[in-house]
């Protein structure tokens, strides 16, 4: 495993240490009663590697225990289309997903559940099935381990409906009624409230019902103003005037949707 930006979060011992240095420290600060003071944690873009081949520390042990083989004997099948390569690649990415799912996502979810806080956030590259393989090998199983499952929606584009429909489908199957989007990043400083309203309504049309709006920074000094704007700070000329009505509209729309049940007429298998 080699990465410049992340540790091996598929390793349960690494995740245990992460929780000890973050969640447990916050809980200690609040006298062991963190759930009385904060609502939850937001996990942002966890992934097993990125646009390269993941090789978590535990994968060799998993292959020996569950498949009875030495993964090193077949590793070349990731790059060569020889006999058995399809089966091996399926197993390889399935194992990566299972290690990620249970050693990171489930651990965080269980800790939050035990301490009275909610886990929300989003993973990465939910926009298509192929992109998901690079980062998590399929996004839908991960939504089980978020109290408020979420997606990321970048730019001004009206993108594919795949991320919203996968999220809402998983939520319906799991009995979750809150579906979150982190949205409006990369829309730019010149984006208008009308454009943002259209972007949000498109997502709400497909079942999203809570927005985590990007971004309200502590400061706009230096390069901070270039952090994937738009920002809803005092540097935004219309934010103070428009946001109360804007947020009120989507608060009411979201509440209506969370109190409703979608009448689904078709299943896509």
Segments from the language model and where they lie:
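Catalytic and substrate-binding clefts that recognize carbohydrates or anionic sugar/phosphate headgroups
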Residues: 1-32
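Carbohydrate-binding surfaces of carbohydrate-active enzymes
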Residues: 28-40, 45-269
């Amino acid at each position: 495993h080699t990465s410049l930006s992340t540790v091996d979060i598929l390793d349960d011992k690494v995740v245990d240490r992460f929780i000890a240095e973050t969640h447990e420290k916050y809980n200690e600060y609040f006298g062991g009663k963190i759930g009385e003071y904060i609502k939850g944690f937001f996990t942002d873009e966890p992934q097993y590697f990125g646009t390269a081949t993941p090789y978590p520390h535990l994968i060799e042990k998993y292959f020996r225990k569950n498949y009875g083989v030495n993964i090193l004997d077949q590793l070349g099948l990731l790059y060569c289309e020889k006999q058995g390569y399809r089966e091996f690649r399926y197993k390889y990415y399935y194992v990566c997903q299972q290690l990620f799912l249970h050693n990171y996502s489930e651990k965080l979810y269980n800790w939050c559940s035990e301490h009275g806080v909610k886990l929300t956030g989003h993973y990465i590259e939910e926009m298509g099935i192929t992109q998901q393989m690079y980062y998590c090998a399929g996004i839908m199983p991960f939504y089980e381990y978020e109290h408020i499952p979420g997606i990321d929606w970048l730019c001004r584009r009206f993108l594919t409906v795949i991320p919203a429909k996968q999220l809402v489908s998983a939520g319906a199957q799991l009995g979750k009624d809150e579906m979150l989007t982190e949205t409006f990043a990369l829309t730019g400083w010149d984006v208008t409230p009308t454009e943002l309203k259209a972007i949000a309504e498109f997502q709400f049309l497909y079942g999203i019902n809570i927005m985590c709006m990007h971004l309200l920074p502590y400061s706009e000094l230096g390069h901070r103003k270039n952090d994937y704007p738009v920002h809803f700070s005092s540097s935004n000329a219309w934010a103070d005037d428009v946001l109360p009505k804007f947020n009120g509209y989507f608060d009411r729309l979201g509440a209506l949707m969370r109190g409703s049940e979608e009448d689904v007429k078709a299943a896509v298998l």
